[in-house]
């Protein structure tokens, strides 16, 4: 019965690539091959390692279909298209090296953006996936305690100071001794010393 229902839905609402909108076969990937190859570029960002940060990984380039999909999710409330991100999470080549990072926490939005959107897009992209991988997902593990100027409006030297003392570990959350995956929609950051980040 479930198979028939899915078949019926596919006839009425055919699957489309979230990147370009082209019709795709439901038995395959959610992204068309062309969009996948245009954005798929897993790597560790150079200069991302610091005393307290093990590295910053990114799975795709932020352009073309990926940029469109993230903008649709953030600003146009196209939440169903977020299921397409799991394809890239599945293909990420370094999950084995992250096995001892047991806790996953999204970078929090400002209170104003959270109120406007009603959700944190990072939760929508990562939460189900991380839970299926056996990670403890703390959607409110970090809170933003003061508003900041959008980073895009600042010079490189001013960006670090803009974020100082902007985040804090939420009351009742203990991360002492934990290695934490700090998640953001445009990159996956690894934090070993959480105090420095907070």
Predicted regions and their residues:
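Glycine-rich phosphate/pyrophosphate-handling loop used in enzymes and phosphotransfer proteins
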Residues: 1-198
């Amino acid at each position: 019965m479930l198979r028939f229902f899915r078949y019926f839905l596919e006839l009425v609402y055919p699957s489309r690539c979230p990147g370009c909108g082209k019709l795709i076969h439901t038995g395959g990937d959610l992204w068309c091959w062309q969009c996948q190859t245009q954005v798929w570029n897993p790597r560790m960002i150079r200069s991302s390692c610091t005393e307290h940060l093990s590295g910053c990984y990114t799975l795709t380039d932020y352009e073309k279909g990926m940029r469109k999909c993230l903008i649709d999710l953030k600003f146009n409330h196209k939440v169903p298209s977020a299921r397409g991100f799991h394809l890239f999470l599945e293909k990420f080549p370094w999950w084995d090296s992250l096995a001892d990072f047991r806790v996953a926490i999204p970078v929090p939005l400002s209170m104003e953006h959270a109120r406007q959107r009603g959700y944190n897009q990072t939760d929508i992209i990562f939460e189900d996936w991380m839970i299926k991988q056996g990670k403890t997902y703390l959607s409110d593990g970090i809170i933003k305690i003061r508003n900041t100027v959008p980073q895009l409006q600042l010079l490189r030297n001013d960006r670090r100071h803009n974020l100082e003392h902007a985040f804090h570990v939420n009351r009742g959350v203990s991360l002492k001794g934990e290695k934490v995956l700090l998640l953001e929609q445009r990159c996956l950051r690894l934090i070993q010393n959480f105090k420095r980040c907070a």
